[in-house]
């Protein structure tokens, strides 16, 4: 499992009271807000668990479907910079947070206040977001959210040689390893590979055994190596 998500359900009476902060929040149409939302997301994705680079067509498909119309609100700092947004919909007494991103703590507080301002018209708030070990309760004065951790995205190594040559190994002494790979979905990855890692942590990868007898020091399928990379 590469990424997990946290699912939050919060009663309106448990949503934290947030003091007013500088800046403004503007409700915008999808057409008017799309580029700003895209820019904030890209700036924030390095700290966003499960964040990926999204094409414009994918944004339109996931966030602007006619069958599930959304609302958009963007937070602008007192200096006029867009620092956060929330995409949401209200249905059946629930404020559904479709996507919530913020670049600063002030933007988080402003948007939390905006969300909370809907307490009089809904019974609960619901949000599913990437999970990186900490949840929304860590940002609240009094933890009140019901949280479920859900499996989300998996990953695999597509081209072993390219992956290893780009991987940032630790610097140190020069070392050479021999790996035998099994990959039923990518036969180009199968075989015995020799990996030499130099003093700067840069790998050189060639197909073929380092040892004369042609046996690999380590043997596993491709998903095992992907799993080890995340441990």
Regions found by a protein language model. Give the residues of each.
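Active-site-proximal cofactor/substrate-binding loop regions of enzyme domains
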Residues: 1-15
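Intrinsically disordered, low-complexity, positively biased terminal segments
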Residues: 13-229
């Amino acid at each position: 499992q590469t990424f997990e998500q946290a699912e939050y359900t919060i009663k309106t009476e448990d949503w934290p009271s947030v003091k007013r902060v500088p800046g403004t929040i503007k409700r915008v149409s999808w057409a008017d807000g799309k580029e700003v939302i895209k820019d904030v997301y890209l700036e924030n994705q390095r700290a966003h668990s499960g964040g990926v680079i999204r094409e414009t067509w994918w944004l339109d498909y996931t966030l602007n479907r006619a069958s599930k119309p959304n609302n958009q609100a963007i937070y602008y700092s007192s200096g006029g910079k867009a620092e956060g947004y929330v995409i949401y919909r209200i249905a059946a007494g629930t404020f559904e947070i479709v996507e919530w991103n913020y670049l600063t703590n002030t933007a988080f507080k402003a948007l939390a206040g905006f969300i909370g301002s809907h307490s009089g018209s809904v019974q609960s708030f619901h949000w599913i977001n990437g999970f990186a070990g900490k949840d929304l309760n860590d940002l609240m004065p009094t933890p009140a959210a019901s949280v479920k951790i859900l499996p989300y995205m998996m990953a695999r190594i597509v081209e072993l040689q390219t992956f290893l040559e780009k991987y940032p190994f630790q610097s140190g002494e020069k070392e050479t390893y021999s790996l035998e790979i099994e990959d039923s979905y990518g036969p180009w990855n199968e075989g015995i590979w020799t990996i030499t890692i130099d003093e700067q942590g840069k790998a050189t990868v060639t197909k073929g055994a380092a040892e004369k007898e042609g046996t690999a020091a380590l043997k596993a399928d491709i998903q095992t190596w992907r799993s080890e990379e995340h441990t």
